[in-house]
């Protein structure tokens, strides 16, 4: 196959429940890749010595018009009726809104349960070509369950990695939470770098804040965890790096609706001096709900009691971290 999308289409057309493996030769592959829902899982792996040897990239802005998006995403009829990924493309190209929005700004989008990615780079190359305003530019979006990502670079600026629970209608759902494991990887961006409603474990992964576009506060995590679900994002044995002194925050809740209370835990990780130790967590995006930490109360036995899922408080935690940015400083009482 001459394109990654053609290889994906061929694998999906087999309609088998057996895993299909796609080896990607070193090179730069410009354009989107859509992996549809299918009976079996798909594995894409780069055959180079390192992840940067295989680079999948395109410049897409969530603020662009559907017409401009169609021009950039579907040259020469890459997506056509009858092809496996047509339903994914059509859910975005048929929009009647002024802009395509964050969910359709992804360079690599998968709805495949059991997707595996290894040893490659996925980048939304919009980068610093736009101003500091709202410019969602997703590099990787996954909707499927039991996704595994290992030794992958995920590069962008705003909403670099978006983990949703959308169904085939391309809308957020309230009855399922897809699971993802990310290991030995590198994720880069500025605003709400990792966002969405999925449950994700990050192990031995580096998060790097690049604020050359915004020149202001940046945010690593923006979980949109449903309030009745206890687990969102977990980062363990990982590294958080930002340039400057206290310019970044670890995250904030992505309050997409009234049933959202983002959940994230960062533990056993290194956090550098680029993070705001006085206020490591920000106010919620969209709702502007002020951050409220849950310190609990002391009972008659001098034991601290607290409901970790109390909707009156945020669910964002740090445990056993190290580095200058890991020191939590209590704000003065008002």
For the regions a protein language model found, what residue spans apply to each?
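Sequence-level preference for short, compositionally simple segments enriched
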Residues: 1-334
């Amino acid at each position: 196959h001459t394109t990654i999308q053609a290889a994906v289409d061929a694998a999906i057309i087999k309609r088998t429940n057996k895993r299909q493996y796609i080896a990607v030769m070193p090179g730069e592959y410009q354009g989107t890749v859509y992996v549809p829902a299918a009976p079996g899982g798909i594995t894409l792996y780069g055959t180079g010595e390192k992840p940067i040897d295989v680079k999948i990239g395109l410049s897409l802005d969530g603020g662009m018009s559907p017409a401009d998006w169609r021009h950039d995403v579907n040259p020469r009829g890459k997506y056509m009726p009858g092809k496996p990924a047509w339903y994914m493309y059509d859910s975005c190209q048929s929009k009647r809104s002024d802009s395509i929005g964050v969910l359709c700004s992804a360079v690599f989008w998968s709805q495949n349960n059991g997707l595996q990615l290894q040893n490659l780079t996925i980048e939304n190359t919009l980068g610093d070509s736009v101003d500091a305003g709202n410019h969602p530019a997703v590099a990787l979006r996954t909707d499927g369950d039991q996704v595994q990502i290992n030794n992958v670079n995920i590069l962008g600026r705003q909403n670099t990695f978006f983990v949703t629970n959308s169904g085939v209608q391309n809308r957020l759902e309230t009855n399922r939470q897809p699971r993802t494991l990310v290991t030995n990887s590198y994720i880069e961006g500025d605003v709400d770098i990792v966002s969405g409603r999925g449950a994700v474990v990050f192990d031995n992964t580096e998060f790097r804040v690049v604020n050359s576009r915004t020149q202001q506060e940046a945010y690593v995590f923006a979980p949109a965890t449903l309030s009745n679900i206890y687990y969102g994002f977990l980062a363990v044995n990982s590294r958080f790096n930002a340039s400057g002194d206290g310019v970044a925050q670890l995250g904030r809740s992505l309050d997409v609706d009234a049933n959202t209370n983002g959940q994230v835990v960062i533990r056993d990780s290194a956090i550098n001096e680029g993070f705001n130790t006085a206020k490591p967590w920000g106010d919620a995006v969209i709702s502007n709900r002020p951050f409220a930490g849950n310190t609990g109360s002391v009972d008659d036995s001098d034991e601290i009691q607290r409901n970790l899922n109390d909707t009156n408080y945020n669910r964002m935690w740090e445990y056993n971290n190290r580095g200058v940015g890991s020191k939590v400083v209590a704000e003065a009482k008002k």
